[in-house]
Amino acid sequence: MAGSSLACCLLGLLALTSACYIQNCPLGGKRAVLDLDVRTCLPCGPGGKGRCFGPSICCGDELGCFVGTAEALRCREENYLPSPCQSGQKPCGSGGRCAAAGICCSPDGCHADPACDPEAAFSQH
């Protein structure tokens, strides 16, 4: 009797708690992400002129980057969308993409990167 009560309690707790890593898994599991088409991330910032680069990062060529501000609040919605997204065109840094002139962003943060500076590409060394 104690064993079945314990099993019922565990099943009840499991039903009441939902870990985000289970909710965010794509259909077919984690590895199925590789088979999906990558879409452009949500627009954000003033006038929707930026793109989300992480859950609290909004960047645009005309805007620069907003990190952890009200302009980046919309980027939290990406966590609830089932398909992966990608912003920026050129890869940079360690798993990042060029977000604005001279700025490389990944979902974890942003840093200055000369590879993302369009003027540096045309300068002579």
Swiss-Prot record:
Domain of life: Eukaryota
InterPro entries cross-referenced by the UniProt entry: Neurhyp_horm, Neurhyp_horm_dom_sf, Neurohypophysial_hormone_CS
Family: Belongs to the vasopressin/oxytocin family.
Cellular component aspect of the GO annotation: extracellular space; secretory granule
Lineage, highest ranks first: Eukaryota, Metazoa, Chordata, Craniata, Vertebrata
Record-given protein name: Oxytocin-neurophysin 1
SUPFAM superfamilies membership: Neurophysin II
Assembly and interaction partners: Interacts with oxytocin receptor (Ki=1.5 nM). Interacts with vasopressin V1aR/AVPR1A (Ki=37 nM), V1bR/AVPR1B (Ki=222 nM), and V2R/AVPR2 receptors (Ki=823 nM).
One of the record's GO molecular function terms: oxytocin receptor binding
Signal peptide interval: 1-19
